[in-house]
Regions:
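Motif-centric detector for short Cys/His coordination patterns
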Residues: 1-91
Length: 91
């Protein structure tokens, strides 16, 4: 059975980018710039100060208004980026 990995650390980097760490050690920068335009629950994220208020809740990244992003989506996104980087750099 597949184990869902939880976000254990989130740190704001710049613009719409957070450095995210999962419970299995997978870590890296994720660009969240696509989310502020994805409907009313995410529209407050257009405000940079509000965007930086992200916190961890239930193993994923969430914001005070109840917006959150499925941890498996974040994991898949980061894993894909990591695999692309490794392939590009011969690792």
């Amino acid at each position: 059975m597949w184990k869902m990995n939880d976000v254990v650390s989130v740190r704001y980097e710049r613009d719409y980018i957070f450095y995210v760490v999962f419970d299995n050690g997978l870590a890296g920068e994720i660009d969240f710039s696509e989310y502020p335009g994805r409907g009313p629950v995410f529209s407050p994220l257009k405000d940079p100060d509000y965007f930086r208020k992200a916190f961890i809740e239930g193993g994923t990244i969430a914001w005070p208004n109840g917006a959150d992003i499925a941890p498996e989506r974040l994991y898949e996104k980061l894993l894909t980026l990591t695999m692309m980087w490794s392939s590009k750099n011969g690792q």
